[in-house]
Each structure stands twice: as structure tokens, then as C-alpha cells.
Amino acid sequence: MTNLTLYQFRTSPFCAKVRKILDFKGLDYRVVEVDYLDRKDLLAASGQLIVPALTLESGETIADSDRIATVLDDLYPVPTIFPLEWRGIHLALARYFDGELEDALFRAALPDEIAHYARLGRGHAAFYRLIRERKYGAGFCDVTVRAHDAAMARAHDLLAPLDATLADRAFLLGRIGYADFALYGQLGYLAIGGDLKIPAEMENLRAWYGRVDRIRATLDPET
């Protein structure tokens, strides 16, 4: 039995990516939901304030989803998330998903994420807005919420080629790998409000999401 601890925010796509990699590898792990306002446990464990952070069996805590994925694949190589012949393409796709696609999905999901933190309390909601507006500028949250339809249309435009790609394959490159987990994490933005908001007409993408979502230690990912 492994002894791993994942420090996370539930709504973080990068944490969702790491959780699903841990599931795929059949590893036992404990999840610590970090309080958005009080990160002292995360700071004590990792020396920094960013999630995801993963405490390994050695007691070392590492941060950054790319680094975590690489270390996990080195420590627990079977099953691999980096098929040798496709490693570079998986990394390139993951960077795109965690960059341009993340920006589009984050903006499309902002109303749901604001509502999530509002449910946690006024202090959480205020701090969430403060962090976002410190990064993107004053008024960012209100402006982005008003532009929600345009943000969702942009997200759908970026997802459409992925839906087409998945018409003849179970996973992005045929065999499941890191890019699938990165995309899965980002699409979590579209489920923050509860129901999955991948358009109904994107049947291939919705089916792919279901396949990845069902992965647990006992599941054959090829099914």
C-alpha cells in the first residue's frame, strides 16, 4: 500500500489531472482539501502555497502537476502515462491544454467558480475575486461574467477539433496517456456547477470524458 497525500482545491483542473493519474496507476492516496483562506498545512508540507502538491512515500512533497506526473511515472512506471513513442506529443498537447485551452475554459466557467466560492462563505468569495483581479486587473470578474456567452463560444470552438479527432479512437493518440489526463483535468471546469457542460452534439468528446472519468484501479482503460 502506498502512502501518498495530495493537497488540492476541488475546482483546480491541475489537481483533477493528478487525481486521475493516481487512479490510473492504482495508487492509494489521501486527499487534503486546502482551505482557500488558510493554507498553513499546505505551506508546512510543501514550503509553498500552490496546489497541487503531493507528499511522496519518501516524505518529500513536490508541487506542479507536470513535475508530479513525471515523478509518479518514474516511481510507478506501470502502467505508464508516457508511451515512449508518443512522449513528446503528449507533453506538447498537455502544454496546449494547460495553456490556451485552460484560459478559455476558465473564463467560460468563471460564473460557476464564483458561485462555488460564494457557497463557502463571503470571505472565500471576496478572496477569490481579489486573487483573480490581482492577476487579470480590476473588474475582471464582473466583465468576464457579462461576456459569458462569448467565452463559452470560444471554448466550444477549441473543443470541436478534439471531438472530431475522437471520432475513430478511444483516446487522443489511440492509447491513453498524459495528454488525456491533462484534457480531462481542464474539462473539469465544465462540471464545477454540477452538470457536465460539454455540448450534447460533441458526442465523441462526451464519451471520451466518460471513459477517463470511470478509470479506477480496477478498470481496464481500454474499455
Name each model feature, range by range.
Residues M1-F127:
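GST-like domain detector, emphasizing the conserved glutathione-binding G-site
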Residues V51, V78, D168-R169, Y184, ...:
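Alpha-helix C-caps/helix-loop-beta hinges
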Residues R206-R214:
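Intrinsically disordered, low-complexity polar regions and short flexible loop motifs
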